[in-house]
Amino acid sequence: RNNRLIAELTTRLPGSMLLCVASDLTGSRQSIVTRPLSQWATATYNYDKIPTIFLLFS
């Protein structure tokens, strides 16, 4: 579901809006990435089945 949410956000919101994806915060694969939605649209990522928090900045 996480990957589908990112894909949906990139098609519905302005490309200049920032999206922060914080995943597996208490695990060994901890990751916090912030980039414009226009970059998320072309990025390679896989956050499925990983506890993830999404933050949007306008």
List PLM regions with ranges.
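A contiguous loop/helix-start segment that scaffolds small-molecule binding in enzyme catalytic cores
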Residues: R1-S58
